[in-house]
């Protein structure tokens, strides 16, 4: 209850860099909307970030790797 969250969207490397940045933002917005629907207070969401394909956690050379790169991350910051 004492945390703020920034929602960070990521993609794999398929598609152009511009497309992937927009896709990662849409992904973050979609998760934000779902969290609000589930009752998270809007003031808890302090930001949305679109990282596109820039920060892969796995290789984009395999389907499994691409699947891992299509993700959302939550950055939590404790409220004072």
Regions found by a protein language model. Name each.
Residues 2-4:
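A general structural motif
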Residues 10-80:
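Periplasmic OmpA-like peptidoglycan-binding domain that tethers envelope proteins to the cell wall
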